[in-house]
A protein has these predicted regions:
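N-terminal Lys/Arg-rich, disordered targeting/topogenic segments
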Residues: 1-14
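Long, low-complexity serine/threonine/glycine- and acidic-rich segments characteristic of extracellular
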Residues: 37-40, 44-139, 177, 181-210, ...
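Low-complexity, Pro/Ser/Thr- and charge-rich linker/hinge segments at domain boundaries
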Residues: 39, 49-51, 138-157, 229-258
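Zn2+-dependent peptidoglycan hydrolase active-site motif and core
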Residues: 312, 326-362, 390, 395
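Conserved, short, structured surface segments that act as functional micro-motifs
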Residues: 344-349, 353, 370-413
């Protein structure tokens, strides 16, 4: 019996000793690791602010939280609103690696406009690594007011409606709806509260009265809906007997030109990504000195190759190979040769406005992507493509609808 008891004690000692060794080793490893981490940790604390986005806009009460899931425990945090320290629960002595400190911010106690929150933090390591983060944000507790500057617009077929919306503050969204099409409005200039867009009236749109609506929304989601009337006046467009282009010329063009479908696809792509501001200033200029207008905008044509159609551009004539220049500041988005339009240059002027210069003899020293100024040469007057004489086919599109370009030379949009 005694021998059995001694055997059990011996067995217990055999188990206990390794267990003690494991425990002591684990503690030593943990202490060593903590000791090592304490002296070597060098990463600055990572602290985030929930509830407020940088450069966001807010009204009323904001539920916020300071959160961290850091590599080393945070010893303290200081929070400043517009350089004045906020007294927050547990913000001074945190003592944890992972934590969340909720707080509420009542913007009604703040002035409308720009504010900032700064968060300074330090960890508990030997180096007391520190970080400082800044969140700029805006307060807007002003009731939204907006109006369309003209309650009614009267416009001819083939012309452009310049819509302007006046607001009492900066807007997040100003969108016009006309004939199921949506047009985004943008500030007339930096810091302006007048938002504008351009609505093209197709030359074949029936003369009638139409309603236009505006969806206006500020940066804190207040919204108003506005309405205005657009009266489209009928225009009697002239008729042309038509013309022919020699088959031999068309066959030659096919050898060196791309299909015009490629041009249309490229324009659709570019117009979706147009610059959200005007690149132009003042009136547009005629791209050549005009000796004669061979074909006015909207003329009804009948040709063998294209059948009956409306000419949605102007054909203007000067001496063969005369210099052609851009009618306004903009960015070259297309420079290529196409079957119908020949050597073609397209210039993006921003806000969905594009001009095209077609049938050029050749190109000036320009490349796609170049920003060019009004009056810069883009090529020479030619008769490439579907043309039977020297002329410039000048086209102006608004949101990819061709309108009368001469209107843009007479009015400041």
């Amino acid at each position: 019996m005694l021998g059995k008891k001694e055997s059990e004690i011996s067995m217990l000692h055999k188990v206990k000793i390794p267990l003690i060794i494991v425990v002591v080793s684990s503690i030593s490893l943990w202490v060593g690791s903590s000791f090592f981490s304490y002296f070597t940790h060098a990463d600055p604390p990572e602290v985030v602010l929930r509830g407020i986005e940088k450069d966001g806009c807010y009204a009323g009460m904001i539920n916020c939280a300071i959160k961290s899931d850091n590599g080393y425990k945070i010893s303290e945090i200081s929070v400043f609103l517009d350089n004045k320290e906020l007294e927050l629960r547990s913000s001074k002595k945190v003592g944890a690696r992972k934590f969340e400190i909720p707080f509420r911010l009542d913007t009604l106690n703040l002035a409308n406009g720009e504010h900032s929150i700064d968060i300074e933090s330090a960890d508990a390591s030997y180096h007391r690594n520190k970080s400082k983060e800044k969140w700029n944000f805006y307060v807007d507790n002003i009731p939204l007011k907006a109006a369309v500057l003209y309650p009614e617009y009267k416009v001819d077929q083939g012309r452009t409606v310049h819509v302007r919306v006046q607001s009492n503050k900066r807007l997040d969204k100003a969108q016009i709806k006309f004939l199921e099409n949506l047009y985004d409005c943008y500030p007339e200039s930096d810091f302006s509260n007048v938002y504008e867009c351009f609505i093209p009236i197709d030359c074949e749109l029936a003369a009638n009265e139409y309603m236009m609506t505006a969806d206006i929304q500020d940066c804190v989601q207040n919204s108003v809906k506005l309405a205005s009337k657009i009266t489209v006046n009928s225009v009697t467009f002239p008729k042309q007997r038509g013309f022919t282009v020699a088959k031999e010329k068309l066959e030659e063009e096919k050898e060196v030109s791309m299909n015009n479908r490629i041009l249309e696809e490229a324009l659709e792509k570019w117009i979706k990504d147009y610059p959200k501001k005007k690149l132009w200033a003042g009136n547009f200029e005629n791209p050549i000195e005009i000796k004669r207008v061979a074909t006015p905008y909207g003329e009804i044509r009948t040709t063998t190759e294209k059948g009956r159609y409306l000419h949605r551009a102007v054909d203007i004539i000067n001496h063969p190979k005369s210099v052609v220049w851009t009618s306004q500041n903009g960015k070259v988005i297309i420079k290529d040769r196409f079957l119908m339009t020949g050597n073609t240059v397209a210039v993006d002027h921003g806000l969905g406005v594009v001009t095209l210069y077609c049938h050029l003899e050749d190109f000036a020293d320009i490349e796609v992507g170049d920003y060019i100024k009004k009056g810069n040469p883009i090529g020479r007057l030619g008769m490439t493509g579907y043309a039977n004489g020297y002329h410039l086919h000048w086209e102006l599109r608004v949101n990819n609808v061709a309108v009368d370009p001469f209107e843009w030379t007479k009015k400041t949009f």
